[in-house]
């Protein structure tokens, strides 16, 4: 059986001379995912097999996550990692508490009002701060931005790929 991989980030550049790389994170739980000692897999152009690396250090710098790997600790050793996609296998995703979901479970879900009217599909999740914001693609209309808060999101069924929301006034531009 083929292994299922999930993107958790992309290396966009190097940082300094001590082998750190700048990562744009695409993971729901960055602090957990990039914890020192964790194993990540780098998928690079021109290579058939992923490169396995172990996180040595992790810190935030501006909008980037800076990672250093135990296997590569200087600028020359990480230069070739630019543009690598960072992934983890499905079995490393871990269990979530009730009411918690991975981004890949939410993206692609159809969003309905409590009255059953289809609004659109979740196409992206933004993480600006206090709560996540779901970007809902709508046919022939501007994308809708829905905050992931209890007063708006009423029911999520990831198996059926359906989400029900309470459509508050002004939440969606027609």
Swiss-Prot record:
Record GO biological process: maturation of SSU-rRNA
InterPro entries, A to Z: PRC-brl_dom (IPR027275), PRC_barrel-like_sf (IPR011033), RimM (IPR011961), RimM_N (IPR002676), RimM_N_sf (IPR036976), Transl_B-barrel_sf (IPR009000)
Annotated GO CC locations: cytosol; ribosome
Ranges where the PRC barrel domain occurs: 98-171
Keywords assigned by UniProt, alphabetized: Chaperone, Cytoplasm, Ribosome biogenesis, rRNA processing
Gene3D superfamilies: PRC-barrel domain (2.30.30.240), RimM (2.40.30.60)
Subcellular location: Cytoplasm
Record's signal peptide: none
Gene Ontology terms, MF aspect: ribosome binding
Domain notes: The PRC barrel domain binds ribosomal protein uS19.
Entry similarity comment: Belongs to the RimM family.
Function: An accessory protein needed during the final step in the assembly of 30S ribosomal subunit, possibly for assembly of the head region. Essential for efficient processing of 16S rRNA. May be needed both before and after RbfA during the maturation of 16S rRNA. It has affinity for free ribosomal 30S subunits but not for 70S ribosomes.
Subunit annotation: Binds ribosomal protein uS19.
HAMAP family recorded: Ribosome_mat_RimM
Protein name: Ribosome maturation factor RimM
Native source organism of the sequence: Bacillus subtilis (strain 168)
């Amino acid at each position: 059986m083929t292994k299922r991989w999930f993107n958790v980030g992309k290396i966009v550049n190097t940082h300094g001379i001590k082998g750190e790389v700048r990562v744009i994170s695409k993971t729901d739980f960055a602090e957990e995912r990039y914890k020192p000692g964790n194993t990540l897999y780098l998928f690079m152009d021109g290579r058939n097999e992923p490169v396995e690396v172990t996180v040595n250090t992790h810190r935030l710098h501006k909008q980037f996550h800076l990672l250093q790997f135990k296997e590569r600790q200087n600028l020359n050793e990480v230069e070739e990692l630019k543009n690598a996609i960072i992934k983890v296998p499905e079995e490393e995703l871990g269990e979530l508490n009730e009411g918690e979901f991975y981004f890949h479970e939410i993206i692609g879900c159809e969003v309905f009002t409590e009255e059953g009217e289809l609004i659109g599909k979740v196409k992206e999740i933004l993480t600006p701060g206090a709560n996540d914001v779901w970007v809902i693609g709508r046919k022939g209309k501007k994308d809708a931005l829905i905050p992931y808060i209890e007063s708006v999101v009423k029911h999520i069924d990831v198996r059926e790929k359906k989400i029900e929301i309470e459509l508050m006034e002004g939440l969606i531009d027609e």
